[in-house]
């Protein structure tokens, strides 16, 4: 898959052939292998995660968003995360528009999914120079269960666009104002987000109404 192949090219160019030879973790990973990993002393995560990839063709209308989402890989251990992450292309190598979705297993990265339909997302816009660092820091916070009220978090998305990269964190309940603001504060704290950055929040039902992920946000902070 392109998002993995591009990372391989980067590793190959750097001369790190050992990384290329390492075993890929794909979306066909079985329960048997996960059990074997744990028996071999790997470190289990609190949540199992899946990584999804969306690549839409620019200029082509009426594309089914759901049909374009492809599940790439899943993992449930610290070692499984790094085996996946080291082969993912950096945001600077991904074409626009592309989305990487990092979600708890069993939750699809769709507004209509049962875990998401009553929720929303915090949105942060980054220049392409710094987005990869903040994205990595966010993933480490999610995998390490460092963000507050982790049960309320569904996942995160990296959206690569022409002139910016957008990172969003999805939560389950948009109507719980205290939880929404608590998540905002936790994200700011763990990403060490400079004061110049503005965070925006948008409920998924609003996205369904205007068919837009990042326009017409209703809360800034």
Swiss-Prot record:
**PANTHER family attached to this UniProt entry:** EUKARYOTIC TRANSLATION INITIATION FACTOR 4E HOMOLOGOUS PROTEIN, ISOFORM B (PTHR11960:SF18), EUKARYOTIC TRANSLATION INITIATION FACTOR 4E RELATED (PTHR11960)
Q: Which residues cross the membrane?
A: none
Species this chain originates from? Arabidopsis thaliana (Mouse-ear cress)
Gene Ontology molecular function, alphabetical: RNA binding; translation initiation factor activity
**The organism's place on the tree of life at top rank:** Eukaryota
Q: How does it assemble?
A: EIF4F is a multi-subunit complex, the composition of which varies with external and internal environmental conditions. It is composed of at least EIF4A, EIF4E and EIF4G. EIF4E is also known to interact with other partners. In higher plants two isoforms of EIF4F have been identified, named isoform EIF4F and isoform EIF(iso)4F. Isoform EIF4F has subunits p220 and p26, whereas isoform EIF(iso)4F has subunits p82 and p28.
Keywords annotated in UniProt: Initiation factor, Protein biosynthesis, RNA-binding, Translation regulation
What is the name of the protein in this document? Eukaryotic translation initiation factor NCBP
Signal peptide region: none
Task: Summarize the protein's role.
Answer: Recognizes and binds the 7-methylguanosine-containing mRNA cap during an early step in the initiation of protein synthesis and facilitates ribosome binding by inducing the unwinding of the mRNAs secondary structures.
**Gene name for this UniProt entry:** NCBP
Pfam families in the cross-refs: IF4E (PF01652)
Q: Which cellular component appears as one GO term in the record?
A: cytoplasm
UniProt lists the family membership as follows: Belongs to the eukaryotic initiation factor 4E family.
Which GO BP terms apply?
Answer: regulation of translation; response to virus
């Amino acid at each position: 898959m392109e998002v993995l192949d591009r990372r391989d090219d980067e590793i190959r160019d750097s001369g790190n052939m050992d990384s290329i030879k390492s075993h890929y973790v794909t979306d066909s990973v079985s329960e048997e292998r996960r059990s074997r990993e744990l028996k071999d002393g790997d470190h289990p995560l609190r949540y199992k995660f899946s990584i999804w990839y969306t690549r839409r063709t620019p200029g082509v209308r009426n594309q089914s968003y759901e049909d374009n989402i492809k599940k790439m890989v899943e993992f449930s251990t610290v070692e499984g995360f790094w085996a996946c992450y080291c082969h993912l292309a950096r945001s600077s190598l991904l074409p626009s528009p592309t989305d990487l979705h990092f979600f708890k297993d069993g939750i699809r990265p769709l507004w209509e999914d049962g875990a998401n339909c009553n929720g929303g997302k915090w949105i942060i816009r980054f220049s392409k120079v710094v987005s990869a660092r903040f994205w990595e820091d966010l993933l480490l916070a999610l995998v390490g269960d460092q963000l507050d009220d982790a049960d309320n978090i569904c996942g995160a998305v990296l959206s690569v666009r022409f002139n910016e990269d957008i990172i969003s964190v999805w939560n389950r309940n948009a109507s719980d104002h205290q939880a929404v603001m608590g998540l905002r504060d936790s994200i700011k704290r763990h990403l060490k987000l400079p004061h110049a950055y503005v965070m925006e929040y948008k409920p998924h039902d609003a996205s369904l109404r205007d068919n837009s992920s990042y326009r017409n946000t209703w809360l800034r902070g």
